[in-house]
Amino acid sequence: MLHRFLWASTLSLLATGPVFAMCTDCDFSGQNLAFADFRDQDLSGANFSDAYLIDAKFDGANLEGADFSGARANNTTFRNARLSDVRFVGAELELADFSGARMAGVDFNDAFVRHSKLTKDQALQSNYCQVPLRDATARGTLCE
């Protein structure tokens, strides 16, 4: 029954587009939010740990202090998002797009970051260059 409810809530989210104009400290941990549209939402302090976020959109969102630990966020976009103090510990971020995102204090410890759009300035603002990562591509050029 719970599984059906979670699936229905995911479908509702997909059908209506952005529905959380402001959802600070919300708990989305472990949820299937593939293709979810969180563009321009205030999700500061939200918990997305262990969530399935494939192809989700967080463009322009305020995610300051959010937790994405263990999340699968492949092909997810964070364009122009506010990501200060976000935790991506152990997250999968293959093909993630961080274009224009503010990333001061972002924690990438043990994250899988591959083929993602990340600038040298963003890498230096976060701990990207100081922590162990799983198969980070282009790390050498960003951290030199």
Show where each model-derived region lies.
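Bacterial N-terminal signal peptides that target proteins for export
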Residues: M1-S9
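Tandem repeat scaffolds
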Residues: G17-E144
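Bacterial N-terminal signal peptides
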Residues: A8-T16
